[in-house]
UniProtKB/Swiss-Prot annotation:
PROSITE patterns in the cross-refs: BRCT (PS50172), DNA_LIGASE_N1 (PS01055), DNA_LIGASE_N2 (PS01056)
Function: DNA ligase that catalyzes the formation of phosphodiester linkages between 5'-phosphoryl and 3'-hydroxyl groups in double-stranded DNA using NAD as a coenzyme and as the energy source for the reaction. It is essential for DNA replication and repair of damaged DNA.
Pfam families: BRCT, DNA_ligase_aden, DNA_ligase_OB, DNA_ligase_ZBD, HHH_2, HHH_5
Similarity section: Belongs to the NAD-dependent DNA ligase family. LigA subfamily.
Protein name listed in UniProt: DNA ligase
Lineage: Bacteria, Pseudomonadati, Pseudomonadota, Betaproteobacteria, Burkholderiales
Signal peptide: none
Binding residues for NAD(+): 47-51, 96-97, 133, 156, 192, 313, 337
């Protein structure tokens, strides 16, 4: 379903309730953006906007650790497994590395200071020894060798589960298919698949000669090649590989290596036949990290491959183990990026895009400009207030930045008389007094703006459906009020409803939804369950067998859970976690639909804004009609008594999961605990009742022991779920 324009007439809550509401909103927004980026390949915001929201969420959760939940984007590695490739569960998770947002020298100093603080080093202690490496702009890969032979290659995926791409990786000549004698019985090598710039240029030249579509940049070309279902296509793409770490390895006691340092491990990888970047070096303390960052930055354009920063890692593996992890990322490593590349171009127009939630986003239509390996023709302006703050008008010369070297945004207008110019023969921004290298003349930017150019105004009617455009009090975003009546929202509402975490309708992807909505085959969610074989089979690229598969998936999705159904409706501010809380508290959909704001406020983690959103949503007759039609189409779930949640065996308990359990995955353990009424938290505090710890538990286990909180192993968890007093302390 969609959200309505009048969902939030109530004033914002204050104090901790306001913080909880803000955290919940940030999580839901970040999850939507991540789904658009990693699964749909249709990002709606620049990387910089995502990073800002992510950092804001990190800051809030750091200040309010009791509000951290396991399903927060900060507690997991982002990504997704693509359909068509076999899922592979990583035995050792492929964690991401924290990105230092400060691109100056102080970024390296801040990391070094954090490490020294975590290690409790006195000011006069010797410098910490690090390994400094380039940060490759490619696709993370895990190579598993058993008995010295490559048996599996898998992408990062979401960090826990990746994609099996062994058939494609075998075509990469830099990756050895077998290793020399003396390697461990089990060896997982982690690294990056990438494409050299010269190979990328040659590939695009061949594409042009054949009349085929060219690739945007080396990273996209490499990622697309690795994810091919046909390895013959991959073999025609010139891919390369750099190794930079290890996953699962046979323990030293069983014949595995006994490395003392990260640098020593890299040297051993080289001896085993894996390519390691020539720039890798040992650095003593922050000063040498800064020097490395500056040197590699100066060499960046001359390197044969793309990088978007450098990586620092504590060299001592013993210190790495001492520092541990912060669930999502290691404390002993950081990625230190370079300032985003910036160019100058002209604003030729300002268009408006309408998103799934009905948000209207002004987008600058630009004179084409080449920024960071991509020709940019559009850049987001975020919202009307941001546009006015930057004072952007049609005809202006603007600075365009590829935030994170991936997605473009307008930084601001180049003011007249600012002493800036563009380098002749390019759009590179330089000082007007000289050229970039002292040889090419620099042309001053255009003069003052013409006085008759009007300010941009947000349209009063939606450019897609003509419905009224509204802006809620206290919000910066304008929204279309059309809901499901707006085709722009209709498509994304259907995709949201069909996604894996909601109704899980396999095969109902973006291209099929485009045809169904554009062809007026469906107008509302219940129309999905009224589809027939003939209406589907006549669509483009939809043979009878494919159509039947979609119908089977739709039929299968009818049997769901109340939480999934609620999440799938797309009620604003109701994410996956809130939907579960509502289902557990009320037990029945009718009870939720008829609940007043005060009743909704009794639900765990539901504040005034969310309560008002839910109440207003179900107060709309057309929303209730859609729900009733879905039930009439056969969508069903098990319901329980409204008070059942209070009688659950673990009701009121807070449990923290850490480490790797022998047989249960984290999601499975979380589901078991939540179904028993427990709250699964992401951090340990005095309010924690139990900590369930597996292998490599890290700092959470240490904190639990420090606070005297009972620690359970997997057997203890099962005992707790059975209602048997567990034998704490076994982990």
């Amino acid at each position: 379903m969609t959200e309505q324009s009048d969902l939030f007439p109530a004033p914002a809550p204050k104090g901790s309730a306001l913080v909880a509401t803000k955290i919940k909103a940030l999580r839901e927004q970040l999850n939507r953006w991540a789904h658009e980026y990693y699964v749909q390949d249709t990002p709606s915001v620049p990387d910089a906007e995502y990073d800002r929201a992510f950092q804001q969420l990190q800051a809030l959760e750091g200040a309010y650790p009791d509000l951290v939940t396991p399903d927060s984007p900060t507690q997991r590695v982002l990504g997704a497994v693509l359909d068509g490739l076999t899922p592979v569960r990583h035995r050792v998770p492929m964690l991401s590395i924290r990105t230092e947002t400060d691109t100056e020298a102080s970024g390296a100093q801040a990391f070094d200071a954090r490490v020294r603080r975590e290690l409790k080093l006195p000011p006069d202690a010797p410098p910490v020894e690090y390994v400094a490496e380039p940060k490759f702009d490619g696709l993370a890969m895990s190579l598993r060798y058993e008995g010295g032979r490559l048996v599996q290659a898998a992408t990062r995926g979401d960090g826990e589960v990746g994609e099996d791409v062994t058939h494609n990786v075998r075509t990469i000549r830099q990756i050895p298919l077998s290793l020399p004698a003396g390697v461990p019985p089990v060896l997982e090598v982690r690294g990056e698949v990438y494409m050299r710039r010269a190979d990328f240029d040659a590939l695009n030249e061949r594409q042009r000669e054949k009349g085929d579509k060219t690739f945007v940049n080396p990273r996209n070309a490499a990622a697309g090649a690795v994810r091919q279902l046909d390895s013959g296509i991959t073999a025609q793409r010139p891919l390369s590989f750099f190794a930079y770490g290890l996953g699962e390895v046979t323990p030293a006691a069983e014949g595995g290596p006994d490395f003392g340092t990260h640098f020593g491990m890299l040297q051993q990888l080289k001896e085993w036949g894996f390519p390691v970047a020539a720039q890798v070096q040992i650095a003593q303390g922050a000063s040498e990290l800064i020097a490395f960052h500056q040197r590699v930055g100066a060499e960046r354009d001359a390197l044969p491959y793309d990088i978007d920063g450098v990586v620092y890692k504590v060299n001592s593996l013993a210190l790495q183990r001492q520092l541990g992890f912060v669930t999502r990322e290691p404390r002993w490593a950081v990625a230190h990026k370079y300032p985003a590349q910036e160019m100058v171009t002209r604003v030729e127009g300002i268009d408006v895009q309408v998103g799934r939630t009905g948000k209207l986003t002004p987008v600058a239509r630009l004179a084409p400009v080449f920024v960071g390996g991509v020709t940019v023709t559009n850049a987001t302006l975020h919202n009307l207030f941001e546009l006015r703050r930057k004072k952007v008008r049609v005809g202006d010369q603007v600075i365009v930045r590829r935030a994170g070297d991936v997605i473009p945004e307008v930084v601001g207008v180049v003011p007249a008389g600012a002493g800036l110019a563009v380098l002749a023969g390019s759009d590179a921004l330089v000082d007007a007094a000289s050229s970039a290298d002292g040889t090419a003349p620099a042309q001053p930017l255009a003069g003052p703006r013409q006085p008759y150019v009007p300010n941009f105004r947000m349209p009063r009617q939606c450019p897609i459906c003509g419905s009224a455009v509204v802006r809620e009090p206290g919000e910066v975003n304008h929204r279309c009020s059309g809901g499901l009546f707006c085709p722009a929202q209709r498509k994304q509402a259907v995709l949201h409803f069909a996604q894996r975490r909601a109704m899980d309708i396999e095969g109902l992807g973006e291209k099929l939804v485009d045809q169904l909505v554009d062809g007026h085959v469906i107008r509302t969610l219940p129309d999905l369950y009224r589809l027939g074989l003939s209406s589907l089979a006549q669509l483009d690229r939809m043979a009878e067998k494919s159509a039947q598969n979609v119908l089977d998936a739709l039929d299968k999705s009818k049997r769901t859970t109340l939480a999934r159904f609620l999440f799938g409706l797309g009620i604003r501010h109701v994410g996956e976690a809130t939907a579960k809380d509502l289902a557990r508290h009320f037990g029945q959909l009718d009870a939720i639909m008829d609940a007043g704001v005060e009743q909704l406020l009794q639900v765990n983690d539901v504040g005034p804004v969310v309560a008002e959103a839910i109440h207003t949503f179900f107060a709309q007759p057309h929303n209730r009609e859609v729900v009733e039609q879905l039930r009439a189409c056969g969508v069903t779930w098990d319901e329980s008594e409204p008070a059942a949640a209070a009688t659950l065996p673990l009701a009121g308990m807070t449990v923290v999961l850490t480490g790797t359990l022998p047989t249960l995955g984290r999601d499975a353990a979380k589901d078991l605990l939540e179904s028993a009424g427990a709250k699964v938290a992401g951090s340990v505090s005095k309010k924690t009742h139990y900590v369930v710890a597996g292998a490599d538990a890290g700092s959470k286990l240490a904190k639990a022991q420090e606070l005297g909180i009972p620690v359970l192993d997997e057997d203890g968890l099962h005992a707790l779920l059975r209602g048997t007093p567990p034998n704490a302390g076994g982990a």
